[in-house]
Amino acid sequence: MENKEVCLVCQDFSSGYHYGIPSCNGCKTFFRRTVMKKQKFVCQFDQNCPVDKSIRCACRFCRFEKCLKVGMDKTSLQASRDPIGYTKRNKKTLRHPMNELSGDESNSCTPDRQLSPLRSFENSLNFLAVRERSANELRMSSYLPKRSLKQALCSKPLINDPIFMSKHATVSPRHTFEKLRFITQDDYHYWHERDWFVLTEYAKTFKVFKNMPYHDKTELVCHAAIVIPVLNQVYNSPDYGLDTVVFPDGTYYDRTHEPTRPAGLNRKKYQVLDLVLKPFREMEINFNEFAAFKAITFLNPDADISLESKHAINEERVLITKQLYAYMVQKDGLEKAIYRFGRLILMGTSMSKMACESKEAVWIADFFENIGFTSFAKELIFGDH
């Protein structure tokens, strides 16, 4: 494919020359908005995140750096011209370059209709990745409202509100660090509250969740209150080895015994390291795989919900599971995909057991007043009753 047909930032189809290089509408808009709003981003990893059409939204720092690296010119940007909008694409029948989602699609020019199954799971996983990126932006912000579980679940989804996200979803100065420090009880409280808030907002982005009765919404979110925060904390942790989970503010925990914490919560910490962190690192789970696995974990029909909601959730869950498997086969080849997919899905069983044991530990800790939960946390852990 000639360069003029490909966005130099993400390798998607180019819609024309923008700011000096061929680029797609998405990267053009992202570059313009970043420059015009003078936005500053922070990479959560080593400033070397992949940027292609399957994962271009995952790290805005690395995406903007790539825009500059491939030649996008800030000086050619004029506020009164080149409005953000849709430019009709040149729909030629073209080969796609090898990339993370589409892989080696074809050895020759292939009509769009023949690529529709691949396009289908590409689009679905892209949507999950965008949702996950937005959820993490909210997690990294300083926004944390005080509200009841009912208020949280009945309000509009903030992640789907672009005006809110542009105003509030910026990285809090608190969520950066220069050196690590061992986590305290207050730090645990802080990050659990943040992750539970983001969980309620994440849940509301699912159409199947929106259509459920309130009782079922509550039960599903409460069922996910242990495992989803664990997934967030582990996947977004910078790599300091297989025995350390690091939070965005530089606080961390490892295998060090914490005598002031209940024994059950110490045990949960070791389970997180062994059952989640270690497999994630060994399998080298990428962003798309994580976004899909998190959705599969959240949409759990084993929650105490109505039969109708169980069917609806299971249908959505099976669809995402099939798309994840197809993606992994496309990316890894059949043999490796079967191993990685099987190992990833089996993690769900171990995590469910961990969640049950953790809730028992929390019940005991609350009974003996070992932990001071907020009313919102109590509703989420013990149910909205």
Swiss-Prot record:
GO MF annotation: an example: zinc ion binding
Localization of this protein: Nucleus
GO cellular component, one term: nucleus
Region: AF-2, residue numbers: 373-384
SMART domains: HOLI (SM00430), ZnF_C4 (SM00399)
Phenotype when the gene is knocked out: RNAi-mediated knockdown abolishes expression of acdh-1 when diet is supplemented with 5 nM vitamin B12 and high levels (40 mM) of propionate.
Matching PROSITE patterns: NR_LBD, NUCLEAR_REC_DBD_1, NUCLEAR_REC_DBD_2
Region (Disordered): 81-110
Protein name: Nuclear hormone receptor family member nhr-68
